Every structure is written in C-alpha cells, then in structure tokens.
Curated annotation (Swiss-Prot):
GO biological process, one term: peroxisome organization
Chief location category: cytoplasm
InterPro entries, per database record: Snf7_fam (IPR005024)
Gene transcribed to yield this protein: SNF7
Pfam families documented for this protein: Snf7 (PF03357)
Swiss-Prot/TrEMBL keywords: Cytoplasm, Endosome, Membrane
PANTHER family linked: CHARGED MULTIVESICULAR BODY PROTEIN, GH13992P
Complex formation: A component of the endosomal sorting required for transport complex III (ESCRT-III).
Membrane topology category: Peripheral membrane protein
A single Gene Ontology CC term: multivesicular body
Cited Gene3D superfamilies: 6.10.250.1710, ESAT-6-like (1.10.287.1060)
Protein name from the UniProt record: Vacuolar-sorting protein SNF7
Annotated compartments: Cytoplasm; Endosome membrane
Length: 228
C-alpha cells in the first residue's frame, strides 16, 4: 500500500537516506539539550558541596559530590553517543552525496547515449562532405550571377577603338587647316592675338587734341558774336 502511494520500492529506497539524516539530526539535537542539562546539574551539585562545607556539614557536602559524580558519568556516556551519531550522520551524508552524484552522472551518460544513438563517424563525415559540396555550389552560383551579361559579340576592343580614333584625328586635321585658310582677313585678324600698337595710340591722341581745339575756336567765335 505504502509502496504504491510513494511510487514503489525504488522511490522508498531513494527516500531512506534523507529520512535517516533527518532522524539523526533530531536525535543529536535532543542529546545536546540533555548534555546542557547534565552540565548544569554538575555545576549545581558542586556549588551545593561548597555551600555545605562552609557550614561545616561534611555529610551533605559528600552527598552532593556523589550526585555530581553520577551526572558526570551520564554526561560521559551521552557525549560518547553524540560522537557516534555525528560520525554516522557524516558517513550517511557523504554516502548520499556520492549516490546523488552517481545518479546525476548516470543521467548525463544516458542523455549523451541518447544523443549519439543516431550518430556515427561515417555519418558525420558524410554530412560534412555534403555541407562542403553545398558551400562550393553556392559559391559557383554566386560567381555565375555576378558575371556581366551579353559578353562576347558585344564586347568592345579597346585597341580597335584607339586605332579608329587615330584615323579620325588624321582625317580631321586637313579639314581644320582648310577652314582656317578660307576665313576672311577681318576674322583672321580677330582671331589673332591683340598686339599693342603705340603708333595708333599717338594718332588717336592728336585727333582728340585737334577736335578739342576746334571746339574752343567755335566757342570763342560764338562769344564774339554775342558781344561777350
């Protein structure tokens, strides 16, 4: 009945170490309280013996010391029990820790086995080869897509272009020379660079001076006619 409630025999065995650890700790705590009580009784009986001695009552002092000895004997046995329980608790805790560690490692091994169950070195190598092939295929496709379209017939030869350009230049030079010869002299003169001519400037100055003298002469004649 209890096995069915707690999950069977395996689950019960799994809970035994924890239950034992709990019970041992509880009993050690109980003995610790008993130890403190005995130590208090020993101190109290010793104080009683001192008190009776100061009063001169050796009989009562002796009885107090006897009780003290009894408590001391009980304390020795109790402390021995506590030592045994603590050693047992330490051993069970260590064993339980080892058990839990082994269970965890077993679960890890089972998980790794499950993961590797569908794998072997041949399959891994085969898969890696397939991946490499697909990567290479992808690179080839990328290179093919990146190449320019309409190559071959429409490809331009740079050397041929240079030769054609030289021929056009040779044909154009005589035509330019003929056009320059056919231009009127006035246009040719305009096309020539301006050269400063000092003689032309001097004659222009003389003409301007003569025009100024004529203006002054006409002005004087007008003044004379007006009687000014």
């Amino acid at each position: 009945m209890w096995a069915s409630i707690f999950g069977g025999k395996g689950n019960t065995n799994k809970e035994l170490p924890k239950k034992a650890i709990i019970e041992l700790r509880e009993h050690i705590n109980l003995l610790s309280k008993k130890q403190a009580h005995l130590q208090g009784q020993i101190t109290a009986q010793e104080n009683e013996a001192r008190k009776f001695l100061t009063r001169g009552n050796k009989t009562m002092a002796k009885n107090a010391l006897k009780k003290k000895k009894v408590y001391e004997g009980q304390l020795v046995k109790l402390e021995s029990q506590m030592d045994s329980l603590e050693q047992q608790l330490f051993s069970i805790e260590s064993a339980n820790l080892n058990l839990e560690t082994m269970r965890a490692m077993k679960q890890g091994a089972k998980a790794m086995k499950s993961i590797h169950s569908g794998l072997d070195i041949d399959r891994v190598d085969e898969t890696m080869d397939e991946i490499r092939e697909q990567v290479e295929l992808g690179e080839e496709i990328s290179d093919a897509i990146s190449r320019p379209l309409y190559t071959g017939a429409n490809e331009i030869d740079e050397d041929e272009l240079d030769e054609e350009l030289d021929m056009l230049a040779q044909e154009t030079e005589p035509q330019v020379a003929t056009k320059e010869q056919a231009l009127p002299e006035s246009k040719q003169a305009l096309s020539m660079p301006n050269i400063p001519n000092t003689k032309i400037d001097e004659s222009k100055t003389k003409i301007e001076e003569e025009e100024e003298d004529e203006d002054e002469r006409a002005l004087r004649e007008l003044q004379a006619e007006m009687g000014l």
